[in-house]
Amino acid sequence: MEEFERRRHFETLAATPQALKAAIRGLSKKTLVFTPAPGKWSILEILCHMRDMERDAYLARYRRILAEDEPRLPDLNGEALAIERNYRNAKAAEVVREWLALRRENLQMLRKTGRAQWARAGVHETAGRLTMEDIIRRHAVGNDEAHLGQIEAIKRRFGILERLAAAPAALAAALKGVPDDVLRRRPEAGKWSMIENAAHARDLERVYQGRFSRMAFGERPAFWMLENDRMAEALKYASADPADVVKEFRRLREDTIALLRALPHETWKKTGLHPTKGELTVEQLAARLADHDEGHIGKIRILRG
């Protein structure tokens, strides 16, 4: 490894404390404990894992390699540690304080490591022979960059699901107490009324459920272009009952959220071909659905006045 590479990895390790504090600043307890997919860790559990790896993996390995000749380096079972150390009930602020202290200790040790010492090595029980250079690369890229990326992905997913969960109540509030004639009045020719916008949101939920399922269980499915005005006429949006629309939208949205929550982590990266937007991941399509909700509920609020 060239000197500039070691320096780059060291700089990554030195920058992570500020990056991590920024990533979790202001997060609610609900966000911290949200699990993005079955069997996947929450942000809180990732923080606990980072703390324990900082101490029991990286700090311990650096120390042993610098002090001993080719020491044996045990593997650590992260899943077992999460259960044994009760990550789910940890206090995030305490965990981060402990991690910061450990990171400072690691940085101090690495600053003092001489050029010849970077070639010293230990023998990992599953990965084989690892030099100090190998370990700092794993520390910076496989640990810091990977876990910061996971935290950002969880925040995005949580935000999307929260937006989706909020839509039924927002739609109900936008329609509540509106006189029937106002509810069904079109603002101008070719523009939908309040009830037509609401019924469209309800029926697009079924379309999106189908798209999510096809993406989850297929390979890059292509989606058809919708003819929204023809749907509105065929399904009689103009005469829909607002209470029924809200009730059905709420039921369908609960099913959509249950479907998305049940998807394995990697499935959120699977793609489909949108007729106008091109290739989209499940995550991107879910964000578009939240945008779609907010767009039509916004139109209803404008029409309500």
Task: Please provide the spans of the model-predicted regions.
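Aromatic-glycine hotspot motif
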Residues: 1-44, 55-305
